[in-house]
């Protein structure tokens, strides 16, 4: 079933309440006359069914709530975490890594593991697939890149289903799994123009020839299951098991409610990985020796794409407690910046590039 037919199928017609006169002459509402299990019972049953059916796909990984070593990072030396932040941050990352390469730091080769979320999933996938190197070699970096990234930004005025998803996402006060499910429901019901094949084409702009494969074992993308609220982590092994190409993993991680997606990974519809209280998913690198963590904000100040609290500093303290040494780079955002506005891209490229010149020597020392 295609995504459009699936959503048409979900549209239901309103059914009026029929009054049925029983033998006693009492008028009974037909809706109440039907024997339906109470909500808690059906919810419990639904959870049991879902857990049983999806237990073997290997995609769901609980978010750590206390310091603990990640099975993915155990025994590794250098790891890198790339957080999210819309089109602005994708452009910032590109300028940043362009500058690091000029300074002698090839971030496509140094880390043994990269965790990317939303914008970070795009740039991480671009780096490790080799596409970023090709793009910066073939094109005038500051001339051509803004044109490429403008294709990623939403081009149409949002409709009411998109506005609903956005407003629900921007009304969240916690990152509980129940809150994630509510946002996920709204994301699923949003009629996003940036969807399906178009999302894949956008993803392939940065990930290159990765629409049929997951070419690197070092790249992990994150997302949130719209139905269950679970954290989804995709690496090469689970990607090949579920038939997930790298371009789709990056697209799902960047499927912001009311803007793009959700994106189908295996048999799960997945939304932006930042829709939780560990927005960069730093717990996945806990136990590695040294982690370079790059986030758009400190979780307290700066532009946001959800109102779910983002205690990034505490997330990082937890992985330090698990034995990981951390260098944390906070990109920061200009006052009043729109993270989804393509007009911001040229400036973001230059800002990231300039920041690389400030950080290069520190990163060299950290990973020496």
Residues covered by each model-derived region:
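Boundary at the C-terminal end of the N-terminal hydrophobic targeting segment
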Residues: 31-35
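Patatin-like phospholipase
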Residues: 12-16, 38-114, 125-368
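Short, cationic motifs built from Arg/Lys/His that form the positively charged side of catalytic pockets
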Residues: 6-7, 88
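Gly/Ala-rich beta-loop-alpha elbow adjacent to hydrolase catalytic centers
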Residues: 116, 120
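N-terminal export signals
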Residues: 2, 8-30
């Amino acid at each position: 079933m295609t995504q459009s037919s699936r959503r048409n199928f979900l549209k239901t017609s309103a059914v009026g309440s029929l009054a049925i006169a029983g033998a006693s002459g009492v008028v009974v509402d037909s809706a109440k006359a039907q024997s339906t299990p109470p909500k808690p019972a059906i919810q419990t049953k639904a959870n049991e069914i879902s857990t049983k059916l999806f237990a073997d796909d290997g995609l769901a990984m609980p978010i750590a709530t206390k310091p603990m070593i990640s099975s993915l990072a155990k025994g590794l030396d250098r790891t890198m975490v790339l957080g999210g932040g819309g089109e602005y941050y994708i452009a910032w990352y590109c300028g940043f890594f362009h500058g690091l390469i000029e300074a002698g730091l090839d971030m496509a080769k140094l880390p043994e593991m990269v965790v990317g979320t939303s914008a970070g999933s795009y740039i991480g996938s671009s780096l490790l697939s080799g596409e970023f190197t090709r793009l910066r070699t073939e094109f005038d970096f500051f001339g051509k890149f803004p044109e490429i990234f403008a294709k990623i930004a939403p081009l149409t005025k949002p409709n009411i289903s998109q506005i609903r998803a956005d407003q629900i996402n921007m009304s969240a006060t916690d990152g509980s799994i129940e809150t994630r499910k509510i946002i996920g429901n709204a994301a699923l019901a949003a009629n996003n123009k940036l969807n399906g094949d178009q999302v894949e084409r956008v993803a392939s702009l940065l990930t290159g020839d990765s629409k049929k494969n997951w070419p690197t074992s070092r790249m992990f993308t994150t997302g949130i299951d719209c139905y269950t609220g679970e954290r989804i982590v995709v690496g090469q092994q689970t990607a090949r098991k579920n038939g997930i190409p790298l371009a789709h993993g990056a697209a799902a991680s960047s499927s912001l409610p009311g803007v793009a997606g959700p994106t189908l990974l295996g048999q799960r519809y997945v939304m932006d990985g930042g829709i939780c209280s560990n927005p960069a998913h730093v717990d996945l690198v806990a136990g590695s020796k040294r982690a370079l963590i790059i986030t758009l904000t400190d979780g307290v100040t700066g532009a946001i794409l959800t109102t779910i609290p983002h205690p990034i500093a505490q997330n990082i303290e937890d992985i330090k407690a698990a034995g990981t040494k951390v260098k944390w780079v906070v990109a920061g955002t200009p006052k009043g910046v729109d993270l989804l506005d393509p007009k911001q891209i040229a400036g973001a490229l230059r800002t990231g590039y300039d920041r690389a010149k400030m950080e290069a020597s520190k990163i060299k020392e950290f990973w020496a």
